[in-house]
UniProtKB/Swiss-Prot annotation:
Annotated family: Belongs to the G-protein coupled receptor 1 family.
Keywords for the protein's UniProt record, in alphabetical order: Cell membrane, Disulfide bond, G-protein coupled receptor, Glycoprotein, Membrane, Phosphoprotein, Receptor, Transducer, Transmembrane, Transmembrane helix
Subunit relationships: Interacts with RPGRIP1L. Interacts with RACK1; the interaction regulates TBXA2R cell surface expression.
Positions carrying Phosphoserine: S329, S331
Cysteine disulfide links: C105-C183
Protein name: Thromboxane A2 receptor
GO cellular component: plasma membrane
GO biological process assignments: adenylate cyclase-activating G protein-coupled receptor signaling pathway; inflammatory response; positive regulation of blood pressure; positive regulation of cytosolic calcium ion concentration; positive regulation of vasoconstriction
Segments in the Extracellular topological domain: 1-29, 88-106, 173-193, 271-289
Transmembrane segments: 30-52, 67-87, 107-128, 150-172, 194-219, 247-270, 290-311
MF GO annotations: thromboxane receptor activity
Cytoplasmic side: 53-66, 129-149, 220-246, 312-343
Protein backbone atom coordinates (compact mmCIF):
# COMPACT_ATOMS: atom_id res chain seq x y z
CA UNK A 1 0.00 0.00 0.00
CA UNK A 2 2.83 2.39 0.89
CA UNK A 3 6.21 2.25 -0.88
CA UNK A 4 8.25 1.39 2.20
CA UNK A 5 5.73 -0.93 3.82
CA UNK A 6 5.76 -3.88 1.40
CA UNK A 7 7.04 -6.27 4.05
CA UNK A 8 4.32 -5.26 6.53
CA UNK A 9 0.59 -5.87 6.61
CA UNK A 10 -1.82 -3.36 5.04
CA UNK A 11 -2.62 -1.79 8.43
CA UNK A 12 0.89 -0.50 9.16
CA UNK A 13 2.06 3.01 8.32
CA UNK A 14 5.45 4.60 9.07
CA UNK A 15 5.39 5.93 12.64
CA UNK A 16 8.53 7.33 14.24
CA UNK A 17 8.03 6.92 17.98
CA UNK A 18 10.30 5.57 20.70
CA UNK A 19 9.33 3.19 23.48
CA UNK A 20 9.97 5.90 26.07
CA UNK A 21 7.65 8.29 24.22
CA UNK A 22 4.94 5.64 24.14
CA UNK A 23 5.26 5.19 27.90
CA UNK A 24 4.82 8.92 28.46
CA UNK A 25 1.76 9.18 26.21
CA UNK A 26 -0.05 5.94 27.09
CA UNK A 27 -0.52 5.67 30.85
CA UNK A 28 -1.85 2.16 31.62
CA UNK A 29 -3.28 3.21 34.99
CA UNK A 30 -5.21 6.12 33.49
CA UNK A 31 -6.60 3.91 30.72
CA UNK A 32 -7.61 1.20 33.20
CA UNK A 33 -9.22 3.71 35.58
CA UNK A 34 -11.06 5.37 32.69
CA UNK A 35 -12.52 2.04 31.55
CA UNK A 36 -13.48 0.93 35.06
CA UNK A 37 -15.28 4.21 35.79
CA UNK A 38 -17.11 3.97 32.47
CA UNK A 39 -18.13 0.35 32.98
CA UNK A 40 -19.33 1.03 36.53
CA UNK A 41 -21.31 4.09 35.37
CA UNK A 42 -23.07 2.14 32.65
CA UNK A 43 -23.84 -0.78 34.98
CA UNK A 44 -25.35 1.67 37.48
CA UNK A 45 -27.47 3.25 34.74
CA UNK A 46 -28.65 -0.18 33.58
CA UNK A 47 -29.75 -1.13 37.08
CA UNK A 48 -31.67 2.15 37.44
CA UNK A 49 -33.24 1.63 34.01
CA UNK A 50 -34.43 -1.86 34.90
CA UNK A 51 -36.28 -0.47 37.90
CA UNK A 52 -37.74 2.46 35.95
CA UNK A 53 -39.19 0.23 33.22
CA UNK A 54 -41.55 -1.51 35.65
CA UNK A 55 -44.98 0.07 35.46
CA UNK A 56 -43.95 2.78 32.99
CA UNK A 57 -46.33 4.16 30.36
CA UNK A 58 -46.18 3.09 26.71
CA UNK A 59 -44.38 6.24 25.54
CA UNK A 60 -41.95 6.12 28.43
CA UNK A 61 -41.39 2.38 27.94
CA UNK A 62 -40.37 3.03 24.34
CA UNK A 63 -38.00 5.81 25.40
CA UNK A 64 -36.46 3.62 28.12
CA UNK A 65 -35.92 0.87 25.54
CA UNK A 66 -33.84 3.27 23.45
CA UNK A 67 -31.93 4.28 26.58
CA UNK A 68 -31.23 0.63 27.36
CA UNK A 69 -29.88 0.18 23.85
CA UNK A 70 -27.68 3.26 24.25
CA UNK A 71 -26.29 2.23 27.65
CA UNK A 72 -25.67 -1.35 26.48
CA UNK A 73 -23.81 0.00 23.45
CA UNK A 74 -21.65 2.29 25.58
CA UNK A 75 -20.92 -0.52 28.05
CA UNK A 76 -19.87 -3.00 25.36
CA UNK A 77 -17.84 -0.33 23.57
CA UNK A 78 -15.81 0.40 26.70
CA UNK A 79 -15.44 -3.29 27.51
CA UNK A 80 -14.20 -4.44 24.10
CA UNK A 81 -12.03 -1.49 23.09
CA UNK A 82 -10.78 -1.03 26.64
CA UNK A 83 -9.59 -4.64 26.81
CA UNK A 84 -7.36 -4.09 23.76
CA UNK A 85 -6.07 -0.63 24.65
CA UNK A 86 -5.40 -1.31 28.34
CA UNK A 87 -3.55 -4.53 27.48
CA UNK A 88 -1.41 -2.67 24.95
CA UNK A 89 -0.64 0.10 27.45
CA UNK A 90 0.48 -2.38 30.13
CA UNK A 91 2.44 -4.74 27.86
CA UNK A 92 3.55 -2.17 25.25
CA UNK A 93 3.63 -4.89 22.61
CA UNK A 94 4.73 -4.15 19.06
CA UNK A 95 1.63 -4.42 16.89
CA UNK A 96 3.65 -5.78 13.96
CA UNK A 97 4.88 -8.69 16.08
CA UNK A 98 1.52 -9.55 17.67
CA UNK A 99 -0.72 -8.96 14.65
CA UNK A 100 1.30 -9.24 11.42
CA UNK A 101 -1.79 -10.17 9.43
CA UNK A 102 -3.75 -7.14 10.74
CA UNK A 103 -6.69 -9.25 11.94
CA UNK A 104 -6.76 -7.58 15.38
CA UNK A 105 -6.35 -4.14 13.82
CA UNK A 106 -9.23 -4.72 11.43
CA UNK A 107 -11.40 -5.97 14.28
CA UNK A 108 -10.60 -2.92 16.39
CA UNK A 109 -11.23 -0.58 13.46
CA UNK A 110 -14.67 -2.10 12.90
CA UNK A 111 -15.68 -1.83 16.55
CA UNK A 112 -14.31 1.72 16.84
CA UNK A 113 -16.53 2.84 13.96
CA UNK A 114 -19.47 0.73 15.21
CA UNK A 115 -19.38 1.94 18.82
CA UNK A 116 -18.65 5.48 17.66
CA UNK A 117 -21.60 5.81 15.32
CA UNK A 118 -24.17 3.89 17.37
CA UNK A 119 -24.65 6.54 20.10
CA UNK A 120 -25.09 9.26 17.47
CA UNK A 121 -27.58 7.23 15.43
CA UNK A 122 -29.46 6.16 18.56
CA UNK A 123 -29.62 9.80 19.66
CA UNK A 124 -31.23 10.69 16.33
CA UNK A 125 -33.65 7.74 16.64
CA UNK A 126 -34.63 8.81 20.16
CA UNK A 127 -35.17 12.39 18.98
CA UNK A 128 -37.41 11.11 16.16
CA UNK A 129 -39.40 8.95 18.58
CA UNK A 130 -39.99 11.85 20.99
CA UNK A 131 -40.81 14.21 18.10
CA UNK A 132 -43.56 11.86 16.87
CA UNK A 133 -44.74 11.13 20.40
CA UNK A 134 -45.16 14.83 21.19
CA UNK A 135 -46.37 16.26 17.88
CA UNK A 136 -48.22 13.20 16.46
CA UNK A 137 -49.49 11.30 19.53
CA UNK A 138 -52.15 9.38 17.56
CA UNK A 139 -50.01 8.43 14.56
CA UNK A 140 -48.61 5.21 16.07
CA UNK A 141 -50.19 2.20 17.82
CA UNK A 142 -49.16 2.33 21.48
CA UNK A 143 -49.18 -1.44 21.88
CA UNK A 144 -46.28 -1.87 19.47
CA UNK A 145 -44.08 0.93 20.81
CA UNK A 146 -41.64 -1.21 22.79
CA UNK A 147 -41.28 -3.84 20.07
CA UNK A 148 -40.79 -1.13 17.47
CA UNK A 149 -38.16 0.54 19.66
CA UNK A 150 -36.11 -2.66 19.92
CA UNK A 151 -36.46 -3.15 16.16
CA UNK A 152 -35.12 0.36 15.60
CA UNK A 153 -32.21 -0.28 17.97
CA UNK A 154 -31.42 -3.46 16.03
CA UNK A 155 -31.51 -1.58 12.72
CA UNK A 156 -29.15 1.07 14.12
CA UNK A 157 -26.71 -1.63 15.24
CA UNK A 158 -26.92 -3.35 11.84
CA UNK A 159 -26.38 -0.07 9.95
CA UNK A 160 -23.36 0.92 12.04
CA UNK A 161 -21.86 -2.56 11.65
CA UNK A 162 -22.39 -2.48 7.87
CA UNK A 163 -20.57 0.84 7.67
CA UNK A 164 -17.75 -0.46 9.85
CA UNK A 165 -17.24 -3.43 7.52
CA UNK A 166 -16.75 -1.27 4.40
CA UNK A 167 -12.93 -1.07 4.73
CA UNK A 168 -12.80 -4.88 4.81
CA UNK A 169 -14.65 -4.80 1.48
CA UNK A 170 -12.17 -2.38 -0.10
CA UNK A 171 -13.65 1.04 0.74
CA UNK A 172 -10.98 2.68 2.89
CA UNK A 173 -8.44 1.11 5.25
CA UNK A 174 -7.97 0.59 8.96
CA UNK A 175 -4.44 1.36 10.16
CA UNK A 176 -2.57 1.44 13.47
CA UNK A 177 -2.69 4.96 14.89
CA UNK A 178 -0.30 7.01 17.01
CA UNK A 179 1.09 6.07 19.53
CA UNK A 180 0.58 2.50 18.27
CA UNK A 181 -2.13 1.38 20.70
CA UNK A 182 -5.30 1.57 18.58
CA UNK A 183 -6.64 1.25 15.04
CA UNK A 184 -9.00 3.53 13.16
CA UNK A 185 -9.84 4.76 9.68
CA UNK A 186 -6.98 6.20 7.60
CA UNK A 187 -6.78 9.95 6.98
CA UNK A 188 -5.09 9.42 3.62
CA UNK A 189 -5.44 10.59 0.03
CA UNK A 190 -6.59 7.26 -1.40
CA UNK A 191 -10.10 7.73 -2.88
CA UNK A 192 -11.44 4.94 -0.67
CA UNK A 193 -9.96 6.51 2.46
CA UNK A 194 -11.39 9.93 1.56
CA UNK A 195 -14.83 8.47 0.78
CA UNK A 196 -14.95 6.41 3.97
CA UNK A 197 -13.70 9.26 6.15
CA UNK A 198 -16.28 11.65 4.70
CA UNK A 199 -19.06 9.07 5.02
CA UNK A 200 -18.23 8.51 8.70
CA UNK A 201 -17.97 12.24 9.44
CA UNK A 202 -21.10 13.22 7.48
CA UNK A 203 -23.27 10.44 8.89
CA UNK A 204 -22.26 11.35 12.43
CA UNK A 205 -22.75 15.07 11.82
CA UNK A 206 -26.14 14.56 10.18
CA UNK A 207 -27.25 12.47 13.16
CA UNK A 208 -26.25 15.24 15.57
CA UNK A 209 -27.92 17.89 13.38
CA UNK A 210 -31.10 15.85 13.08
CA UNK A 211 -31.20 15.39 16.86
CA UNK A 212 -30.79 19.14 17.36
CA UNK A 213 -33.58 20.02 14.92
CA UNK A 214 -36.14 17.49 16.18
CA UNK A 215 -35.36 18.14 19.85
CA UNK A 216 -35.75 21.88 19.31
CA UNK A 217 -39.18 21.39 17.73
CA UNK A 218 -40.22 18.99 20.52
CA UNK A 219 -39.12 21.40 23.26
CA UNK A 220 -40.90 24.29 21.51
CA UNK A 221 -44.09 22.20 21.32
CA UNK A 222 -43.88 21.31 25.01
CA UNK A 223 -43.33 24.95 25.95
CA UNK A 224 -46.26 26.05 23.77
CA UNK A 225 -48.60 23.54 25.39
CA UNK A 226 -47.32 24.24 28.89
CA UNK A 227 -47.59 28.03 28.64
CA UNK A 228 -50.68 28.09 26.43
CA UNK A 229 -54.33 28.27 27.42
CA UNK A 230 -54.43 24.62 28.48
CA UNK A 231 -55.81 23.69 31.85
CA UNK A 232 -53.62 21.95 34.39
CA UNK A 233 -55.06 18.61 33.26
CA UNK A 234 -53.95 19.30 29.69
CA UNK A 235 -50.37 20.31 30.43
CA UNK A 236 -47.43 18.01 29.76
CA UNK A 237 -46.85 15.23 32.22
CA UNK A 238 -43.77 15.29 34.40
CA UNK A 239 -42.42 12.27 32.51
CA UNK A 240 -42.67 14.15 29.19
CA UNK A 241 -40.53 16.94 30.62
CA UNK A 242 -38.14 14.42 32.18
CA UNK A 243 -37.63 12.56 28.90
CA UNK A 244 -36.94 15.76 26.98
CA UNK A 245 -34.45 16.98 29.59
CA UNK A 246 -32.61 13.65 29.37
CA UNK A 247 -32.69 13.69 25.58
CA UNK A 248 -31.36 17.25 25.42
CA UNK A 249 -28.57 16.24 27.80
CA UNK A 250 -27.64 13.26 25.61
CA UNK A 251 -27.61 15.50 22.54
CA UNK A 252 -25.39 18.15 24.18
CA UNK A 253 -22.92 15.51 25.41
CA UNK A 254 -22.75 13.86 21.97
CA UNK A 255 -22.23 17.21 20.25
CA UNK A 256 -19.43 18.31 22.58
CA UNK A 257 -17.67 14.93 22.54
CA UNK A 258 -18.01 13.94 18.87
CA UNK A 259 -18.27 17.04 16.69
CA UNK A 260 -14.58 18.05 17.11
CA UNK A 261 -13.46 14.61 15.87
CA UNK A 262 -15.98 14.50 13.01
CA UNK A 263 -15.02 17.97 11.79
CA UNK A 264 -11.31 17.14 12.12
CA UNK A 265 -11.70 13.96 10.03
CA UNK A 266 -13.55 15.81 7.26
CA UNK A 267 -11.04 18.68 7.23
CA UNK A 268 -8.03 16.35 7.19
CA UNK A 269 -9.13 14.08 4.32
CA UNK A 270 -10.07 17.15 2.23
CA UNK A 271 -6.96 19.13 3.13
CA UNK A 272 -4.80 20.51 0.34
CA UNK A 273 -1.92 19.80 0.27
CA UNK A 274 -2.73 16.36 1.74
CA UNK A 275 -2.05 15.78 5.42
CA UNK A 276 -0.58 12.34 4.68
CA UNK A 277 2.67 11.99 2.76
CA UNK A 278 3.02 9.53 -0.16
CA UNK A 279 4.82 7.17 2.25
CA UNK A 280 1.74 7.06 4.50
CA UNK A 281 3.11 9.23 7.28
CA UNK A 282 1.13 11.95 9.07
CA UNK A 283 2.73 14.93 10.74
CA UNK A 284 3.20 14.58 14.47
CA UNK A 285 0.79 17.49 15.03
CA UNK A 286 -1.96 15.75 13.04
CA UNK A 287 -1.38 12.46 14.87
CA UNK A 288 -1.59 14.15 18.26
CA UNK A 289 -4.72 16.07 17.29
CA UNK A 290 -6.42 12.85 16.19
CA UNK A 291 -5.49 11.19 19.49
CA UNK A 292 -6.80 14.13 21.54
CA UNK A 293 -10.10 14.32 19.64
CA UNK A 294 -10.54 10.56 19.95
CA UNK A 295 -10.02 10.72 23.70
CA UNK A 296 -12.58 13.52 23.95
CA UNK A 297 -15.05 11.40 21.94
CA UNK A 298 -14.65 8.43 24.29
CA UNK A 299 -15.92 10.56 27.19
CA UNK A 300 -19.34 10.22 25.56
CA UNK A 301 -19.50 6.60 26.75
CA UNK A 302 -18.95 7.69 30.36
CA UNK A 303 -21.18 10.77 30.36
CA UNK A 304 -24.22 9.18 28.65
CA UNK A 305 -25.25 7.06 31.66
CA UNK A 306 -24.80 10.00 34.04
CA UNK A 307 -27.16 12.11 31.93
CA UNK A 308 -29.90 9.59 32.69
CA UNK A 309 -28.87 9.05 36.32
CA UNK A 310 -28.69 12.76 37.19
CA UNK A 311 -31.60 14.01 35.06
CA UNK A 312 -34.22 11.68 36.50
CA UNK A 313 -37.39 13.24 37.92
CA UNK A 314 -36.40 12.45 41.52
CA UNK A 315 -33.12 14.33 41.10
CA UNK A 316 -34.64 17.23 39.15
CA UNK A 317 -37.26 17.74 41.86
CA UNK A 318 -34.48 18.54 44.34
CA UNK A 319 -33.54 21.58 42.26
CA UNK A 320 -37.02 22.35 40.88
CA UNK A 321 -39.59 21.50 43.60
CA UNK A 322 -42.42 22.96 41.53
CA UNK A 323 -42.18 19.92 39.28
CA UNK A 324 -43.49 17.70 42.08
CA UNK A 325 -46.13 20.11 43.43
CA UNK A 326 -47.91 21.27 40.31
CA UNK A 327 -50.88 19.37 38.96
CA UNK A 328 -50.01 16.31 36.93
CA UNK A 329 -51.69 15.98 33.55
CA UNK A 330 -53.17 12.92 31.93
CA UNK A 331 -51.28 13.45 28.66
CA UNK A 332 -50.38 15.88 25.94
CA UNK A 333 -53.10 14.51 23.72
CA UNK A 334 -56.07 16.71 24.76
CA UNK A 335 -54.28 19.94 23.92
CA UNK A 336 -52.78 18.60 20.70
CA UNK A 337 -56.14 17.14 19.71
CA UNK A 338 -57.82 20.49 20.24
CA UNK A 339 -55.19 22.22 18.13
CA UNK A 340 -55.59 19.70 15.30
CA UNK A 341 -59.40 20.09 15.44
CA UNK A 342 -59.12 23.88 15.10
CA UNK A 343 -56.84 23.57 12.11
Amino acid sequence: MWPNASSLGPCFRPMNITLEERRLIASPWFAASFCLVGLASNLLALSVLMGARQGSSQSRSSFLTFLCGLVLTDFMGLLVTGAIVVTQHFVLFEWQAVDPGCSLCHFMGVIMVFFGLCPLLLGAAMASERFLGITRPFSRPATASQRRAWTTVGLVWASALALGLLPLLGVGHYTVQYPGSWCFLTLGTDPGDVAFGLLFALLGSISVGMSFLLNTISVATLCHVYHGQATAQQRPRDCEVEMMVQLMGIMVVASICWMPLLVFIAQTVLQSPPAMSPTGQLSRLTERQLLIYLRVATWNQILDPWVYILFRRAVIQRFYPRLSTRSRSLSLQPQLTRRSTIH
